[in-house]
């Protein structure tokens, strides 16, 4: 099973049936996994911000956890207005962003980026989330998804997860 198949199946088993997002190279595997799962629906927006607000509206209207996704870099940054909306309205929403291949991260002080659209999304999301993480080791996905789900669905709820 692909890691993204696991992510979609995990969220589907938790009750998420609708995913809102905007396609991009670094999130393509997740989108493929959403599309091939017969128990969920993908809703493509014209902009990542629209996907974020759609997930917020879904969570508010349904009283259930919403989910939005975007690719890395500017795509992920475009989610932030919706992320803040979910945070301030205490809405249960999980945001998933694409990331670089792990070998592409620079980690070099003074070097802006090495990989395609490299951006520190976790630092950008932390002020308006209850939890923001970048999962670099596939072995950690089970633990991080369970923690993400638990935090997103607690009384003071909201979560952003960067995968």
Describe each model-derived feature in a short phrase.
Residues 1-163:
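N-terminal alpha/beta PP-like core and its mobile active-site loop of ThDP/TPP-dependent enzymes
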